[in-house]
A protein has these predicted regions:
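Short glycine/acidic-enriched loop and turn motifs that connect beta-strands
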Residues: 85-90, 95-97, 160-165
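Repeated scaffold domains used in trafficking and secretory/extracellular systems
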Residues: 65-72, 135-147, 187-199
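Surface-exposed loop/turn elements that mediate protein-protein interactions on large endomembrane-trafficking
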Residues: 35-64, 97-136, 167-194, 207-272, ...
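Structural signature of eukaryotic scaffold interfaces centered on beta-propeller domains
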Residues: 53-55, 60-75, 144-151, 317
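Sec-dependent signal peptide cleavage junction
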Residues: 21-36
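Residue position within the beta-strands of beta-propeller blades
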Residues: 81-83, 157
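N-terminal Sec-pathway targeting helices
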Residues: 1-13, 24
Length: 320
């Protein structure tokens, strides 16, 4: 009888031990799951330093970025990119009663990295927007563009509060690393090249150049810059090997499929020089100009335009 009782007790002890071990594993597993669920997630936006070429008396800038697209702001004195590390905010983190999103944590940052076009090697400098802002509940939008005014480069930034959709627009003076309200810039939002585009549009020449650049080279021409079409397929088709540009600037031509932008710096910009230069660059190797035509809207007559001055003369003889 005692031997039977000992066996029963032994079995019970074993069962209790197994049960305890199972419960311990479940608690441990649950704890890990909770930690994983509560672990803070972050959204990062970082654009590596692009390839930069400054050429032709430092008037023109060629910027290439490996793997194509990315946030870059193209200026007179700086090429700027974002370096951002921000919390991913979910509903549980928002205090609706206090009408706001969580405060900016110490490990969050919203920085603008700017590469100096006027210094050898294009060294970088960091503008820490959160430090300049002093506000601890606004987060920045993941977007970058450039506004040029008063001979300075500015980066507009949209700030927002997650909890109540409140937003604020500021503008960052990259040269002096200061913040100003966007309201102080009356000309903001107006196209810098609208007048140049109108000049080139006489006789539909502007659209003629755009069409030629797209069909021949899969590049997008505008009154102020050249970049690539958005689709990856178009990038793969880019081939400028038989152009004057490739002959004159072989190092840049090698990076053409990674082109982010080719532009004339704002302070040095003139419609005449941009127009004439592009016609020469993208002419077939050995030829003077890309073949483009002005069209008389009344008669349909086409006239080849070989320079900005020729376009002006044609326009004077064909008033609309």
């Amino acid at each position: 009888m005692k031997r039977v009782n000992k066996k029963v007790v032994g079995v019970l002890v074993l069962l209790v031990s197994i049960g305890s071990f199972y419960m311990w594993k479940q608690v441990q597993k649950h704890g890990k799951t909770s930690q994983q669920e509560t672990k803070q997630k972050y959204i990062d936006a970082k654009t590596e330093k692009p390839t930069i070429h400054l050429f032709d008396d430092n008037k023109f800038v060629f910027v290439a970025q490996k793997d194509g697209l990315g946030g870059i702001a193209f200026g007179q004195d700086y090429i700027s990119v974002l370096d951002v590390h921000q919390k991913q905010i979910n509903e549980s983190m928002i205090d609706r009663e206090k009408n706001g999103s969580p405060k900016i944590a110490k490990d969050e940052y919203f920085n603008i990295i700017s590469y100096d076009l006027n210094a050898s090697g294009f060294p970088s400098k960091k503008t820490e927007v959160y430090q300049l802002l002093g506000k601890k509940e606004y987060r920045g939008a993941y977007d970058i563009s450039l506004y040029y005014a008063d001979n300075k480069d500015y980066i507009p930034v949209t700030l927002y509060k997650v909890g109540n959709n409140e937003s604020r627009k500021i503008i960052v003076d990259i040269t002096n690393q200061k913040i100003e309200d966007l309201e102080n810039f009356e000309g903001y939002g107006k196209s810098t090249f609208s007048a140049a585009e109108q000049e080139m549009s006489k006789g539909n020449v502007y659209n003629n150049i755009r069409q030629a650049m797209k069909e021949k080279y899969h590049l997008k021409f505008t009154a102020g810059y050249i970049d690539t079409l958005l689709s990856k397929e178009d990038r793969e088709k880019i081939d400028i090997s038989n152009t004057n540009f490739a002959q004159d600037y072989p190092e840049m031509a090698k990076d053409i499929k990674d082109l982010a932008r080719l532009y004339m710096r704002p302070k040095q910009y003139s419609t005449k020089e941009w127009f004439d230069t592009v016609l020469h660059w993208f002419a077939p190797k050995g030829q003077n100009v890309l073949e483009v035509y002005a069209t008389d809207q009344k008669t349909g007559e086409k006239t080849q335009i070989k320079s900005y001055d020729e376009l002006q003369a044609w326009s004077a003889n064909h008033p609309e």
